Structure formats: C-alpha cells, structure tokens
UniProtKB/Swiss-Prot annotation:
NCBIfam families to which the protein is assigned, alphabetical: PRK02135.1
Protein's UniProt name: tRNA (pseudouridine(54)-N(1))-methyltransferase
Pfam families: Methyltrn_RNA_2
Organism encoding this protein: Haloferax volcanii (strain ATCC 29605 / DSM 3757 / JCM 8879 / NBRC 14742 / NCIMB 2012 / VKM B-1768 / DS2) (Halobacterium volcanii)
Lineage: Archaea, Methanobacteriati, Methanobacteriota, Stenosarchaea group, Halobacteria
Subunit structure: Homodimer.
CDD domains according to UniProt: TrmY-like
Amino acids binding S-adenosyl-L-methionine: L128
Tree of life domain: Archaea
Length: 198
C-alpha cells in the first residue's frame, strides 16, 4: 500500500465554497485536487494500491481509498466536488469514526498529528526534504507513507512531528517540486524499484 498525506493549511473545512473558484475562494483546494489526481491516475486506469489523506485546516481528514474509489475523474473540479461532498458529511464523523460520502471517500475529525500517527502505524514514513538523502540511494520501502504540504511550508509543529515520525528523509532531485509533481516522481521511483526496473 502506498499512502500520501497532504496537509492543506488554507483548505476549507465547510462545504461552503464554489467549485468555480477552487484556486482562490476555496483556499487553494486546487493544489490538493492535483495531488489526488497525481496519486491515483494512470493513463487508462486508477492505482488501487494507493490511499490519500487530505488534512483540511488541521481539523478534518478526507481519505481516498484507491481500491474502492468510484466517480473520480481526472479534472480538479470533479475532485473538489468529492471533497465538498465529504465536507457535507462532516457532522456524521463522530470522533475518529469516519463518515463515507461516496464510494472510496470518507471524512474523519482528525488533524495532522492524529492522521500521521494512524497512517504511520503500518507504514514506512518518508519525509521529503531538500536536505534529505538522494532518493536513488534509498531502498524503496514496501509500504511507504509520503507526507507533503500544500503551497505552504509545514508549520514548525508539523515539521517536528514529521521529523520524529520519519523513518527515511529523502530528496527527489536537485530542485524543489510542487506536491503533485513530487507524488508523480515518488510513484515512478516505486514503480521502477528505485529506478532499476523498466
């Protein structure tokens, strides 16, 4: 299982946003939507062995489960609609118990720390960092959990939690990439067994 946590610092925590303004009025929800699409889409298929956790404003986590996903289309607007539908169910999420909003999409009342702890319980936590080891020098983990931020840096508290939880600290290349591009590169690294199998 490949997992990705993406924290959205300005992401909406209510469904009161326009699907026509996800890059502005919805707190750069477009960044999170691109991450979801990069995590799941192949040319003519969906990666079923992937789970994505979107942390919205450190208040809710929307989980996408690849093996159960339906109605995910490769455009940001329809992905934002799935997130909005999940937020419409937020009152049904009791404690850490999820509320399913559509097949493969659920919402939980969990912030970054709890989401990281839960996802890390059966995964190798990989911190992507510009000062990390080159990814080509690191053996691809069997059940990786990549943790990324939106267009903002991690807060100091998030960075400390991640540093404490990380099993590996790697960099994907000489340049800093957008979160959605990092997901694509991470998939390629795993698909090719560390760039050794094509």
């Amino acid at each position: 299982m490949r997992q990705f946590i993406v924290t959205g610092h300005d992401a909406p925590t209510t469904p009161d946003f326009s699907l026509d303004d996800i890059a502005g009025g919805a707190g750069r929800l477009d960044v999170l939507c691109r991450c979801v699409n990069s995590a799941f889409f192949l040319s003519h298929d969906i990666r079923e062995d992937v789970r994505v956790h979107l942390v919205l404003g450190d208040e809710y986590t929307v989980r996408f489960e690849g093996s159960e996903l339906r109605r995910l289309n490769p455009d940001e607007r329809s992905t934002a609609a799935l997130i909005r539908k999940a937020l419409e169910k937020r009152e049904e999420a009791i404690g850490h118990m999820p509320a399913e909003s559509s097949p493969g999409v659920s919402i939980r009342r969990m912030g970054f720390e709890t989401t990281l702890e839960e996802a890390a319980s059966d995964a190798t936590v990989v911190e992507l960092h510009e000062d990390g080891d080159p990814v080509v020098q690191v053996e691809p983990p069997e059940n990786p959990l990549f943790v990324l931020s939106d267009h903002h840096d991690f807060t100091d508290e998030e960075a400390e939690l991640l540093a404490a939880a990380a099993d590996e600290r790697v960099r994907l290349g000489p340049e800093i990439l957008h979160a959605d591009h990092s997901i694509t590169v991470a998939h390629n690294y795993l698909d090719t067994a560390g760039y050794s199998r094509y």
